[in-house]
């Protein structure tokens, strides 16, 4: 539900926490991020969205209308977790994948999931660089990320690239 740090950058997990405690910590961190974005939080629930915000969104996934997708379980768990804090994430399971790409290209989809094969080379340009082919789909325009992606492309040393790409993904 949330990153491993809260909105202030503090670690939310400690050694010895149970899975239930970690889950609760993640939900609390998520509420902190929502509150920082202008949402109203009352008694551990989202109760109002800021101007221009909403308490619901639709996550679109091309899972054949039957949940047949590698990300479907994670998306379902996220939807349930968000619902528990007052945010409704509706899952739109498409049977026709072309509807996903049409929606992405027209900018009418709130959130989406897709899956594809990876290449043996961990090059991140196509997906994460502002000028990469998929960047418009992710709406990622971060100069720092672009620099790390380009830095990783300058070496054939796999350990070096792994460290640079880990930093980029963090």
Regions inferred by a protein language model and the residue ranges of each:
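Paired acidic/hydrophobic, glycine-rich loop segments that form the ligand-binding mouth/hinge
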Residues: 110-114
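Proline- and acidic/polar-enriched loop/turn elements at helix boundaries
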Residues: 45-47, 94, 116
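Solvent-exposed loop/turn segments at secondary-structure junctions
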Residues: 63-67, 96-98, 116-121, 169-170
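Extracytoplasmic/peripheral linker and loop segments enriched in polar/acidic and small residues
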Residues: 23, 84-100, 125-170
């Amino acid at each position: 539900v949330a990153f491993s740090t809260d909105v202030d950058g503090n670690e939310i997990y400690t050694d010895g926490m149970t899975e239930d405690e970690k889950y609760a910590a993640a939900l609390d961190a998520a509420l902190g991020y929502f509150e920082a974005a202008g949402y109203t939080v009352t008694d551990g629930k989202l109760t109002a969205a800021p101007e221009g915000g909403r308490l619901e969104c639709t996550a679109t996934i091309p899972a054949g209308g039957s949940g047949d997708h590698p990300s479907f379980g994670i998306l379902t768990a996220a939807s349930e977790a968000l619902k528990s804090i007052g945010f409704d994430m509706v899952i739109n399971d498409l049977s026709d994948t072309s509807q996903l790409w049409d929606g992405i290209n027209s900018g009418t989809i709130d959130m989406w999931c897709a899956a594809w094969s990876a290449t043996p080379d961990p090059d991140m340009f196509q997906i994460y660089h502002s000028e990469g082919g998929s960047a418009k789909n992710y709406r990622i325009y971060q100069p720092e990320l672009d620099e790390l992606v380009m830095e990783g492309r300058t070496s054939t040393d796999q350990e070096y690239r792994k460290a640079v790409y880990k930093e980029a993904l963090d």
